[in-house]
């Protein structure tokens, strides 16, 4: 996913700046991109607030069967990213880019970008200075959750370390509106996703590496160093894996839909207790361009409640629980089909056959992804969340009074409009482990792994690494596993066998 014009304005925090450190070829035929990390200051969080000021706090998106590229529109690059250095042209013109497994195009600012502030603050590609430039001219545009770019395609040589990819199609960005790319520490983005979601169907750089025989094995892998005291930020390995980067064996799961590195995910556990949310299956995307771990509002609210994260009060949610909570509880006890409950009590206008959209709003215009402002949509989504929450508590044999009190508390923990939720830095030891089930194996995240620290000393803040993102069926429910997860687990992107592998990082 990257999640995009459907705007998930999340934006947090501490981030790792992945600058190009060193590229090296080894005897095993792999090429390594050394990564360095830098902490982001609070400017990006402020920028995100400005960018998202007019946006809705909670969103659900309906993506059609051909909506693969739509997820890109949700992407937000203002939280934390990994960067590296590449060059375009002959002689090489250097750019810092995000190595992003959640998108597939390469773009950098163009010298023909005259009126966007972002272009003035970053290096620009000058085709007239490259002897290997070939004119293309096809128009291109990409919309993100907190930003957009537009421009045209060109062809030129792209250098990644010692690898020179010939005749690579890329986008020269001539428009970068908004504040997102103004404050960004990177110049452009290098997508490592599948060609299926590439704007203009341009072959990704990774595809041409393989096609031109620059890489022996169709595999690349990420190791992200989460130790803030070490200078080395991590490593991106093209052509294989480094056994020193992980412990034990990888758990592999097949890619279920080419476009993103998407796979099936099982249940989510909080403190070892199943939530049941993904018992019937959820989809997940491994995304190096996202710092946090994003999931449906319903379950993210439960997680943030368990870790003591403070969000904003949703009056709509509390109103629904106050007026209909007991009715929902009674219907569940009478074994009414959960997906039909909200329509039965008149809060939803459908009977659940289209699938439950676990969010506060739903999008009916999939092409333009316009948000609905109807109060009815909000009440329907609040009802759907309440059904899931009450189900979860019934499985634990809680009393009716305790269940309704718990659901009211969850309403108060709904994420803030920024998507971020603060936690008490002094309470890490009391927070539960949060676990994801992938390929039948449980992958744990401890508090120190999912809580992100912004700033130092008395002004330091701790932020939950979980943010809400609602994608309606058939694409959703969808999870985005960003750096919070990939930092704990070394990740292998096996293009040849179309699978993703996870093992504990060393």
From Swiss-Prot:
Signal peptide: 1-24
Residue ranges constituting the Peptidase A1 domain according to the UniProt record: 82-503
Induction: By light and during senescence.
Active site positions, chain numbering: 100, 287
A GO CC term assigned to this protein in UniProt: secretory vesicle
SMART domains, A to Z: SapB
CDD domains linked to this entry: phytepsin
Stated pH dependence: Optimum pH is 5.0-6.0 with insulin B chain as substrate and at 37 degrees Celsius.
Domain Saposin B-type: 312-417
Molecular function via GO: aspartic-type endopeptidase activity; endopeptidase activity
EC annotation from Swiss-Prot or TrEMBL: 3.4.23.-
Biological processes per GO annotation: lipid metabolic process; proteolysis
Disulfide bonds: 113-119, 278-282, 317-411, 342-383, 348-380, 425-462
Spans through the membrane: none
EC class name: hydrolase
Pfam families: Asp (PF00026), SapB_1 (PF05184), SapB_2 (PF03489)
Places the protein is found: Vacuole
Keywords on record: Aspartyl protease, Disulfide bond, Glycoprotein, Hydrolase, Protease, Repeat, Signal, Vacuole, Zymogen
Top-level division of the source organism's lineage: Eukaryota
InterPro entries: Aspartic_peptidase_A1, Aspartic_peptidase_AS, PEPTIDASE_A1, Peptidase_aspartic_dom_sf, Phytepsin, SapB_1, SapB_2, Saposin-like
Tissue expression as described in the entry: Expressed in roots, leaves, stems, petals, carpels, seed pods and dry seeds.
Residues in coiled coil: none
Functional summary from the UniProt entry: Involved in the breakdown of propeptides of storage proteins in protein-storage vacuoles. Possesses aspartic protease activity in vitro.
Matching PANTHER family: ASPARTIC PROTEINASE A1, BETA-SITE APP-CLEAVING ENZYME, ISOFORM A-RELATED
Family: Belongs to the peptidase A1 family.
Name of protein: Aspartic proteinase A1
Natural source organism: Arabidopsis thaliana (Mouse-ear cress)
Gene name of this polypeptide: APA1
């Amino acid at each position: 996913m990257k999640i995009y014009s459907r705007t998930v304005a999340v934006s947090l925090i501490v981030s790792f700046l992945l600058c190009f450190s060193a590229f090296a070829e080894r005897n095993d035929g792999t090429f390594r991109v050394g990564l360095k990390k830098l902490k982001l200051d609070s400017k990006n969080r402020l920028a995100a607030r400005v960018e998202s000021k007019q946006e809705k706090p909670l969103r659900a998106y309906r993506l059609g069967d051909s909506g693969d590229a739509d997820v890109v529109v949700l992407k937000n690059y203002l939280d934390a990213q990994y960067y590296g250095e590449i060059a375009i042209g002959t002689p090489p013109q250097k750019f810092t880019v995000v190595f992003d497994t959640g998108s597939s195009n390469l773009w950098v600012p163009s010298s023909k970008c005259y009126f966007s502030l972002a272009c003035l603050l970053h290096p620009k590609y000058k085709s007239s200075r490259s002897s290997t430039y070939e004119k293309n001219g096809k128009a291109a545009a990409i919309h993100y959750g907190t930003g957009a770019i537009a421009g045209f395609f060109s062809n030129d040589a792209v250098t990644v370390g010692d690898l020179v990819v010939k005749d690579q199609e890329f986008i020269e960005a001539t428009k970068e509106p908004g504040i997102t790319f103004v404050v960004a520490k990177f110049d452009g983005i290098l997508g490592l996703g599948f060609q299926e979601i590439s704007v203009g169907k341009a072959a990704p750089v990774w595809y041409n590496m393989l096609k031109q025989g620059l890489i022996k094995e169709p595999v690349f892998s990420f190791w992200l160093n989460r130790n803030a005291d070490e200078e080395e930020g991590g490593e991106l390995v093209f052509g294989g894996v480094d056994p020193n980067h992980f412990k034990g064996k990888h758990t592999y799961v097949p890619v279920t839909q080419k476009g993103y590195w998407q796979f099936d995910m099982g249940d989510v556990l909080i403190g070892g207790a199943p939530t049941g949310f993904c018992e019937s299956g959820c989809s997940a995307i491994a995304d190096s361009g996202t710092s946090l771990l994003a999931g449906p509002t319903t379950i993210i609210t439960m997680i943030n409640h368990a870790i003591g994260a403070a969000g904003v009060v949703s009056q709509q949610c509390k109103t629904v629980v106050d007026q209909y909570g007991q009715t929902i509880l009674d219907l569940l006890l009478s074994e009414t089909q959960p997906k039909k409950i909200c329509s039965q009590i008149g809060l939803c206008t459908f009977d659940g056959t289209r699938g439950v959209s676990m969010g506060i709003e739903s999008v009916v215009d999939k092409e333009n992804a316009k948000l609905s402002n109807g109060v009815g949509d909000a009440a329907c989504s609040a009802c759907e969340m309440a059904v899931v929450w009450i189900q979860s508590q019934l499985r634990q044999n809680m009393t009716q009074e305790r269940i309704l009190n718990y659901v009211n508390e969850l309403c108060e923990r709904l994420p803030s409009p920024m998507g971020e939720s603060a936690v008490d830095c002094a309470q890490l030891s009391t927070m539960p482990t949060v676990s994801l089930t992938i390929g039948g194996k449980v992958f744990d995240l401890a508090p120190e792994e999912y809580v992100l620290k912004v700033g130092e000393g008395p002004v330091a803040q701790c932020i939950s690494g979980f943010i809400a993102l609602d994608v309606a069926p058939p694409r959703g429910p969808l999870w985005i596993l960003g750096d919070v997860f990939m930092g704990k687990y070394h990740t292998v992107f096996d293009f040849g066998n179309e699978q993703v592998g996870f093992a504990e990082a060393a």
